Amino acid sequence: MLSLLVIFFIKFEKIEKGESIEQIQSPLIGKNIPNIKIIKFNENQKISFSKYKNKRFILNFFASWCLPCKIEAPLLNKVSSKIPIIGIAYKDKEEDMIKFLKNYGNPFSEIGVDQLGSIAIEWGVYGVPETFLIDENGKIIYKHAGAISHEVYKDKIIPFINND
């Protein structure tokens, strides 16, 4: 708990200094993904990251009530044909999430549910959307806070997909 408090204050200090949220780096970069249980939406099973072993994938925290999530939806739908994307529904109601996916498309290979926000805390998420690029060894190599822009798509996601 103390470590989360320290991370919060470091991030808050950087925001106060004028750094944009997108520029703030995660302490998880270069580390293995957190080993926590994520229950799948509409299933009583957990997401198994072992099936992504030796594969690159994207993990995206989103919510139906999140305007930037709606803005990035077309790019995530475009990316989903090239690489698996795991979605984590953050503090969302089931019926709202279903409506969101119907209206904006479902780019996700699997969807996990984070009703209480505890999964987001473990991942160091402080808002939605946040997107993580995870390499074939299960290491987080990049984190983006905020909606995925065409620039991030071109400069970060495409090279990640192409393993450049």
Give residue ranges: language-model regions:
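Thiol/disulfide oxidoreductase modules built on the thioredoxin-like
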Residues: 103-107, 114-164
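Structural microenvironment flanking redox-active thiols in thiol-disulfide oxidoreductases
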Residues: 70-105, 115-121
